[in-house]
């Protein structure tokens, strides 16, 4: 198993976002703003869904990587650190998913 983590990818996205948009796809996405980055995330998510629905494991792996990357770009633009997302996941996993969902609906 690889030692590469989402935190590693977040650091790379941060570094590359500071480059020239002519030199870095990440910088180009960031310079294009949230609407462009969010649209690209949506496109990649649809491609991942299609790969999952057709049982194409190799393509699903590829598209899942794209989704994670583009999600981190969207989070970068929104100035939401991955740590915040992980804390939310940790909070949610402290109880069953059904209970957590019921609590959200009653709020």
Curated annotation (Swiss-Prot):
It comes from the Bacteria. SUPFAM superfamilies: all-alpha NTP pyrophosphatases (SSF101386). One of its GO terms (molecular function) is ATP binding. GO terms for cellular component: cytoplasm. Pathway: Amino-acid biosynthesis; L-histidine biosynthesis; L-histidine from 5-phospho-alpha-D-ribose 1-diphosphate: step 2/9. Its EC number is 3.6.1.31. Keywords: Amino-acid biosynthesis, ATP-binding, Cytoplasm, Histidine biosynthesis, Hydrolase, Nucleotide-binding. It is an enzyme of class 3 (hydrolase). GO terms for biological process: L-histidine biosynthetic process. InterPro entries: HisE, PRib-ATP_PPHydrolase-like. It is found in: Cytoplasm. It catalyses: 1-(5-phospho-beta-D-ribosyl)-ATP + H2O = 1-(5-phospho-beta-D-ribosyl)-5'-AMP + diphosphate + H(+). NCBIfam families: histidine_hisI, PRK00400.1-3, PRK00400.1-5. Belongs to the PRA-PH family. This is Phosphoribosyl-ATP pyrophosphatase. The lineage of its organism: Bacteria, Pseudomonadati, Pseudomonadota, Alphaproteobacteria, Hyphomicrobiales.
């Amino acid at each position: 198993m690889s030692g590469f983590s989402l935190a590693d990818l977040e650091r790379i996205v941060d570094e590359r976002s500071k480059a020239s948009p002519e030199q870095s796809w990440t910088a180009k996405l960031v310079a294009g703003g949230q609407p462009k980055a969010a649209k690209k995330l949506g496109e990649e998510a649809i491609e991942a869904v299609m790969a999952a629905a057709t049982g194409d494991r190799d393509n699903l792996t590829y598209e899942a990587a794209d989704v994670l990357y583009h999600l981190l770009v969207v989070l970068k633009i929104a100035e939401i650190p991955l740590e915040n997302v992980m804390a939310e996941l940790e909070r949610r996993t402290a109880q069953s998913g059904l209970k957590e969902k019921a609590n959200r609906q009653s709020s």
